[in-house]
Amino acid sequence: MGEVRERSFELYPPRTRAGLDPGLPGEFAARLARLRKAHRELSGRRDAGSLGVIDLAPIKERMGPRWDIVRPIVWANVEACLARGLEDVELYVAADEVTVWVLALARERRELERRLALIAADIGERLLGVAPGGAGPVARTLPFDYETELATLAGMLGLRERVRRAQRQLAEAEAARLREHATELVALYRPVLALRVPLIVGFRAFARLATASGALVVPWTLCPDPATGAFDAELDRWLLAQAMTHLVPGRPKAELPVLAVPVHRSTLATPGFRGPWLNLLTELPAVMIPRLILELVDRTPQRPPADLRGMLASVEGRVAFVIVRVPPDPSAIAPLAGSGARAASIDASTLDPADPGTVVRLAELAAACRAAGLRSLLVPVANAVLAEEARAAGIDYIAGDACLPPLRAPGPPMDLRKAARAT
């Protein structure tokens, strides 16, 4: 039954009146022209506009091999929610089996973001019975000049090319934003403390931006609302290059650090971002590979992707091992089993040390890591109470202000007991 449905399912024609049909080029062009006119009248600007993108990839990842069977159900719900959430002149078009482009009226990008978030939430709610674990779509927007880009457009091929061009231009602008401020970036290294035995086992590298007042802030203040992963990919390359300056052959082994360097999921998942980053990584001398650990991160910790093993295959043999950043949810840790990751770095930013249930929750997280064959790292640990709770719960490692402050240059692993006796 599933095979029949898969063969018969097509993205076109759309299932609602709000959908654009590339098979009808005359109507395709006429509806885009009406949208441009309405948007110009609304905004008062010829260059205004944002393209909405609804990404169904998280649902496909969650469904795994069942995707081909449930895809018609997913799309029926997606199109129904779009039809309900869009105005008469507004449009959507399926770009591929996991991507919808939304052309809607909005005076500013934020307004469209809010509307798309509501539509995405509606889709996720309707799919609760189909996608276990509550997997839902991701909505985002990118600036898109309706007046110029939609003019003289009569088909999907032209629209696809213009969207890709807009994405390339935006990616270049976001990457340039970081390069323009590269001299203000600072690489810092935070010690990672083992809890069973007081050892500094390594350092987590991270970047900060030095302001005119001398304060250090997160680099994302330069690009708080990215439409592509270009800014993060540029930051990943910059930080990897800084870390590699501390992994130079010829230094005594006792002086060499062990470094965990972050890379964003979007960097590894996007060929155009992954290639330059991997090219830099290959410059690391083979003898230094045991000293470099990769930490897969997101700006906000997410559940691991279904294709994590394939994603990590690109770095196999080029780093000592991989850590994956996850939210504080045992169900987000279980999928790491067999993925190639060796540890989970658990986000502690939402944990309340004063909550009596925190120790129990930490114990569940530590147990989930052990069940998946992983070491557990809790970050950031901001105070001594949470550090002690992590120790009591069986967490393996912690890093944060409660341990030791970050350094401008990392040092070698250190037994804190010996260091204490030496002083």
Set out the residue ranges of the language-model regions:
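Cyclic nucleotide signaling catalytic output domains
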Residues: 118, 122, 138-173, 221, ...
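Bacterial c-di-GMP phosphodiesterase EAL domain
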Residues: 165-286
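Alpha-helical scaffold within the catalytic cores of cyclic-nucleotide enzymes
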Residues: 76-86, 111-132, 239-249
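Conserved helix-loop-beta segment at the catalytic/binding core of cyclic-nucleotide signaling proteins
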Residues: 49, 79-109, 132
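EAL-type cyclic di-GMP phosphodiesterase domain
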Residues: 62-66, 212-238, 265-273, 284-320, ...
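Conserved long alpha-helical elements within nucleotide-processing catalytic cores of c-di-GMP signaling
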Residues: 5, 9-36, 43-50, 57-80, ...
